[in-house]
Amino acid sequence: MAGSGAFPLVLAGGCISCVGTLAGLGAPPTAIVWLDAHGDFNTPETTISGFLDGMALATAVGRCWGKLAATVPGFHPVPERQAVLVGAREFDVNERTLLDSSAVHLIDPQRIRNHGLRAELEPLWAKIQTYTGRAYLHFDLDVLDPAEAHVNQFAAPGGLTLTELLGIVSLVRERFALAAAAITAYDPEYDEGERAVRAAVGVIRELSKQV
């Protein structure tokens, strides 16, 4: 699909689906903008739960499951300096230590509110553009504050508003060619009034402006 010029939009249950999406993109190098309430940066050595989706970003940048990920044709780890984690506010202790020692860029919701979206993100986009001009956008819908939309059992307070989320998409589109996007981790059992569905549709509409 990517080779045909079509835009891949992946609707997935779990974040580890990123391995297949990135594999399908192939060369040239890609940045990752990962929007999630959690770090997804555990490894088999740090995880408390053993939850594979909690290791998804770490796998994408080559921190763990390297031999397994290498069995997916076309997959190559994304350099950490090209990965941005936005909106995360819940971490396991050892996961946070690992993340802080990495080259992954971490932007929490409070920094966005303190400095503004553009002021916080534009300098970072400029830095990453020295490595690549295209990006993969990954949305775990629990990046949203539960007051906006309760999307699954892992929802955590202090998240992004839908306005902030759509603003991030817009800023990415301004500076990068979008190679693909994924929307993940929706559980209808927790979605009161279909607010999460409406939020996801809003994201898709914003993404469609790229196509």
Protein language model annotation of sequence segments:
Residues 35-37, 86, 137-141:
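Active-site flanking residues adjacent to catalytic metal/cofactor-binding acidic residues
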Residues 42, 91-93, 188-190:
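Active-site environment of divalent metal-dependent phosphoester hydrolases
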Residues 84-92, 161-166:
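A general structural motif
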Residues 2-73, 175-176:
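Active-site histidine-anchored catalytic micro-motif
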Residues 32-34, 83-85, 106, 180:
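Conserved beta-strand scaffold positions in the cores of enzyme catalytic domains, especially
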Residues 77:
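A conserved, positively charged/aromatic
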Residues 1-10, 17-24, 98-211:
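Catalytic cores of soluble, metal-dependent hydrolases
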